[in-house]
A protein has these predicted regions:
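Surface-exposed acidic/polar loop and edge beta-strand patches at domain peripheries
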Residues: 1-124
Length: 124
């Protein structure tokens, strides 16, 4: 199991391996695993952007990879609280007064912790 920083077409990326699979995530683009492959067979599981598709990927990251969707589903009234902190989001479904998920698929983030085990990788 390993986690390492790599260059992915000029962008800083994280390459990680566990359980016979390898993956790439680009934190500056968002929480989207842009590559997932089975190492032994060489099978690519996700649509990974090629170098000439990077601008398309930046504009429409949902077309490639596997976006991590947080928070799931909808947030009633666009507000929730966690650990004594209240988070407010814009209402994106006015008819239901809800905010819809998908907020981190294209938001840059900073990795604060990594961990590897015999058959897993954790990235926060």
């Amino acid at each position: 199991m390993q986690i390492e920083k790599i260059d992915f077409y000029g962008m800083s990326a994280i390459h990680f391996e566990a359980g016979g699979y390898e993956a790439i995530m680009i934190p500056e683009i968002g929480a989207n695993v842009v590559k997932l492959s089975h190492k032994a067979s060489g099978t690519n599981i996700l649509r990974t952007p090629a170098e000439d598709e990077i601008e398309t990927f930046k504009g429409r990251p949902q077309v490639f990879g596997l976006p991590l969707l947080f928070p799931p589903n909808r947030i009633e009234d666009g507000t929730y609280s966690f650990e004594n902190r209240t988070y407010k989001y814009p209402i994106t479904i006015p008819a239901q007064n809800n905010y819809h998920h998908g907020i981190i698929k294209s938001q840059p983030f900073i990795i604060t912790r990594t961990e590897t085990g015999n058959d897993y990788v954790e990235i926060e």
